[in-house]
Amino acid sequence: MATSNNAKFSIGEVVKHRHFDFRGVIYDVDFEFNNSEEWYQSIPKEVRPRKDQPFYHLLAESNEVTYEAYVSEQNLLLDKSKEPVKHPLIEEIFSGKKGSSYFKISN
């Protein structure tokens, strides 16, 4: 798990996508793009994010569907709703929630 001063968001924060209708809780951070080139090229060129920025791993939800998402910092906004994220893996990674943030389970 990574933490750094150059990431705008932190592990445990609930965020929403700037352009698409989904939200999620951050469970890991890559400080620059760290996925496959095939995945990157599958994003339409006109909306493809820069690689030289943090990318976040999310336990995401959209309507009644849950999944894991990999999203660039430029496409995220803080979710201020304080509503819990309803993802089946939340309890495996986080031990609780206070306000709008989740807390990691200590190893």
Locate predicted features.
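Residue-level recognition of conserved beta-strand positions in structured domain cores
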Residues: 26-28, 60
